[in-house]
Each structure stands twice: as structure tokens, then as C-alpha cells.
């Protein structure tokens, strides 16, 4: 027994120290496991501590290899095929206690006669982690934060019905989508023509008062659509707004992309980068110039924001953090998608009632050369083609969001339930109902 002691003391853990503390498993063959990569720390395999008397028949890697070589069995937990016990031996689970030192194969054999709901739940959690590529349902730093339990939609209503509040009204709110959570994020300086947007968003995010920012609502925010028209006429309609949203949502780092975004911010400890982008996008949507009183959003602005929201949907599905069930990201997606669906449904209502919101601002500015001319940038369409083109475009945009909402529902089902998960399920179902209602209205 004394001769075996040095060999046992030199034996390293099958899982790294970080995973062992959380009672998780990882692969020792890899230079760094997924959990350590998320936390941005190297894997450390210390010597396994063994206290108490060793078991009567300890199983080693060689014994396991011989057994698998003869019988060709598969381990019921790790599902490792026969002859590949070297990979299975890397998942040794060391439990500290009186004479408790066994492998996952021993644990599964012992648990066959006394299976409990807790053990089956643990197996299901490990299975879900292997299926979707994350180590634990509680791995997401958003779910571990205190704001996860106190989540609330912090978008206070405006003074009158149908008018969303200015970002300045959000300064006193709290929650994951509020400016207080985003106070540590720097907003870059935008070009001169985006001065109203930069000042408004910066005041909404940082809540600055004093010498840094002087409140001048008349100069910061355009007072009417005529001033917004001048900004549009300067080439801001699509390319300029694209630069503005990229500067606001990506901190001035260029085009939004899943690979570049996660490479620059692979796993942020403060907040998921996708959730941060969507929170800022919500503030951009609630800007007074986009939601005027007794008026509807411009059609070109609606189409552009729908494209931005669709790209964020795609980035979230490829984000490493959001793949581990970030409920905050799903909630923000529901909010932004609901805004776009409402705006598209307004267009469908106008078309059904014989009205439209396309020519109100561009009529007479650029008359078409003939009845088949369609000016996409200025949206000056022929009277006979305007309704049919708009109807086809709105149908396409609405149907494109249907599979996205189905994917969001599947991601939400991966959770263990709770108030936020139920709220997301309700929002997704409401958005789906609005899409079907708008499509039915277009068919009529």
C-alpha cells in the first residue's frame, strides 16, 4: 500500500481545477477547455487529493482499456465507443470524501440501482451542454448576474399615447437594458451631421449632468420632420444611417459581424456584446425623430431598422455567449422585432385602407420619368406600381421574420422556466400573432 502512494499522489485530475470546483468535467487532452476559454484563463490540472482508505478494487485506465478492448462496450454516460478508453479516462471525476474515488463509469454503475431525479437532471444538463456546445446551463454570466432576477423592461411610456419616451427619460431607470448598466461603455464621436444622435444617445447612456453636457433640446433634437428631411437629403438615408448605427452599437469598430465581434470581445464579463448592441438599438428606435407624435415611422427607416434587427438575429445565433441561452438577448430581440412588426403592420393597414405613407414627404421632389420608374432611394413610385411593389416588399419582410421567431422559441425552451422565460414566450407568441395578422391583412 505504501508503494502505491507516490503514484497516486502524482496522478492529476481528469478535469481542470476550475471545472472540478464547479463539479463539471472537461477534456484534459485539449490545451484549454470551453469553460476556461469563456472565463479567459488557462487550464490548471493539479494533483488529485485523496483522503481516507482507497477502494478495494480501484479501476485504472489500463484496466478500463483492457475491458473495452475485450467487450467493446460503450460507457452509458460519456457514450464513448469501445477501444477509445483513453478519451474516457480523461473524464475522471474525483470526489473528495471518505474513500470516494471513482470514475464516471463507476458512478453510472452505482447509480443504476438508486437513480434519483437529481441525478437524471444532472445527466440531462450535461447532455444539453454537449448538444449545444456549452458546459452548463448556468455558464452564462448574464444568468449569474443579479440583474437577471430583477429584469424589467425599462421603457417608460411617453406623455401621450403612441409616443415613445426620449432616451433622456431613461436616465433614472434600472435594469439590464437601462443606461445605468451601460454606463461603462464609451460612445464614440459621430460625424457632424449625427450631432443630434450622438448627444441624445450619450446623455441617455451616461446620464451626464454638469459641465460635460448642456441640455439644449431645441439644438440637439430636430424639432420637426423638415429638419430631418435636410439630413435625409444629404445622403443619410441608408449609408449614413448604417454608419450611425454601427458607431453607436459597435463602439465605432466598423460593420457588425459575428466573427469580428466575438473575436474582439470573445466573452465579456460585464455583459453580452449582442445584448449591449440591442439595448443601444432600442434607444435609437425610441429617438424622438423616429417616433413623432401623431405620426408613423418613415417607410425607408422601417425597412432599414428591420434589416439591422435581422442581422442582429443572425449574429446572436452565432454568438458563443448567446448560444448558452442568454435570456436577456432573447428579450431584447423580442422588443426590437416587435417594433419593426408594428411599423410594417401600419404599412399593411394603410395599403388595405387605400392610403400609404410613402409619398407624403417625397411627392414632387423627383418625378419618375415614366410609369415604370421606381426611385428606391427616394421612394417615388408610380401610382399604379406603388401599392403592388410595397405590398410585395412588406410580405417578403414579414415572412422573413417567421423562421427567426421559431428559432427564438426553441432557444427559450432550453431554459428551466421562470418569470423571464415565460415573458419571452408570451412576447414571441404575440409577435407571431402580429405577423400572421399583417399577412392576412395583406391577402385581403
Swiss-Prot record:
User: From start to end residue, where is composition biased (Polar residues)?
Assistant: 76-89
Q: Which UniProt keywords apply?
A: DNA-binding, Metal-binding, Nucleus, Transcription, Transcription regulation, Zinc
User: Which residue ranges does the record annotate as region Disordered?
Assistant: 49-89
- Is Membrane among this UniProt entry's keywords? no
Q: Which PROSITE patterns does the record cross-reference, listed alphabetically?
A: ZN2_CY6_FUNGAL_1 (PS00463), ZN2_CY6_FUNGAL_2 (PS50048)
Its localization reads: Nucleus
Would the keyword Oxidoreductase turn up in this protein's UniProt record? no
**What is the additional note?**
Gene clusters encoding host-selective toxins (HSTs) are localized on conditionally dispensable chromosomes (CDCs), also called supernumerary chromosomes, where they are present in multiple copies. The CDCs are not essential for saprophytic growth but controls host-selective pathogenicity.
Name the chain's protein.
Answer: Transcription activator AKTR-3
Q: Which organism is it from?
A: Alternaria alternata (Alternaria rot fungus)
The gene name reads AKTR-3
Amino acid at each position: 500500500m505504501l508503494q502505491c502512494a507516490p503514484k497516486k499522489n502524482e496522478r492529476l485530475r481528469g478535469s481542470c481545477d476550475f471545472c472540478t470546483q464547479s463539479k463539471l468535467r472537461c477534456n484534459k487532452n485539449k490545451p484549454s477547455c470551453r469553460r476556461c476559454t469563456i472565463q479567459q484563463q488557462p487550464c490548471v490540472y493539479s494533483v488529485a487529493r485523496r483522503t481516507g482508505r482507497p477502494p478495494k478494487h480501484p479501476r485504472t485506465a489500463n484496466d478500463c482499456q483492457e475491458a473495452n478492448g475485450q467487450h467493446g462496450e460503450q460507457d452509458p454516460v460519456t457514450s464513448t465507443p469501445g477501444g477509445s478508453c483513453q478519451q474516457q479516462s480523461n473524464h475522471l471525476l474525483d470526489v473528495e470524501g471518505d474513500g470516494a474515488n471513482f470514475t464516471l463509469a463507476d458512478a453510472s454503475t452505482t447509480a443504476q440501482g438508486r437513480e434519483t431525479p437529481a441525478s437524471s437532471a444532472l445527466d440531462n444538463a450535461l447532455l444539453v451542454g454537449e448538444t449545444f456546445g456549452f458546459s452548463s446551463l448556468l455558464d452564462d454570466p448574464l444568468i449569474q448576474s443579479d440583474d437577471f432576477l430583477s429584469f424589467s423592461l425599462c421603457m417608460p411610456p411617453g406623455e401621450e399615447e403612441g409616443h415613445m419616451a426620449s432616451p433622456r427619460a431613461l436616465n433614472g431607470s434600472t435594469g439590464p437594458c437601462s443606461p445605468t448598466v451601460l454606463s461603462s461603455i464609451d460612445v464614440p464621436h459621430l460625424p457632424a451631421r449625427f450631432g443630434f444622435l450622438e448627444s441624445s444617445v450619450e446623455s441617455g447612456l451616461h446620464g451626464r449632468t454638469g459641465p460635460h453636457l448642456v441640455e439644449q433640446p431645441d439644438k440637439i433634437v430636430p424639432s420637426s420632420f423638415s429638419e430631418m428631411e435636410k439630413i435625409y437629403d444629404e445622403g443619410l438615408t441608408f449609408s449614413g444611417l448604417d454608419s450611425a448605427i454601427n458607431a453607436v452599437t459597435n463602439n465605432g469598430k466598423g460593420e457588425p459581424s459575428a466573427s469580428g465581434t466575438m473575436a474582439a470581445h470573445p466573452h465579456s464579463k460585464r455583459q453580452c456584446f449582442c445584448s449591449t448592441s440591442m439595448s443601444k438599438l432600442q434607444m435609437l428606435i425610441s429617438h424622438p425623430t423616429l417616433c413623432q407624435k401623431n405620426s408613423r415611422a418613415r417607410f425607408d427607416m422601417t425597412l432599414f431598422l428591420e434589416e439591422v434587427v435581422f442581422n442582429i438575429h443572425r449574429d446572436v445565433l452565432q454568438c458563443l455567449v448567446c448560444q448558452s441561452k442568454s435570456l436577456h438577448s432573447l428579450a431584447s430581440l423580442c422588443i426590437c422585432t416587435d417594433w419593426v412588426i408594428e411599423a410594417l403592420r401600419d404599412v399593411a393597414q394603410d395599403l388595405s385602407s387605400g392610403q400609404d405613407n410613402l409619398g407624403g414627404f417625397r411627392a414632387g421632389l423627383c418625378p419618375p420619368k415614366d410609369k415604370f420608374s421606381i426611385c428606391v432611394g427616394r421612394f417615388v413610385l408610380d401610382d399604379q406600381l406603388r401599392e403592388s411593389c410595397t405590398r410585395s416588399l412588406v410580405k417578403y419582410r414579414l415572412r422573413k421574420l417567421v423562421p427567426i421567431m421559431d428559432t427564438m422559441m426553441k432557444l427559450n425552451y432550453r431554459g428551466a422556466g421562470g418569470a423571464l422565460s415565460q415573458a419571452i414566450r408570451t412576447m414571441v407568441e404575440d409577435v407571431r400573432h402580429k405577423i400572421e395578422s399583417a399577412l392576412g391583412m395583406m391577402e385581403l
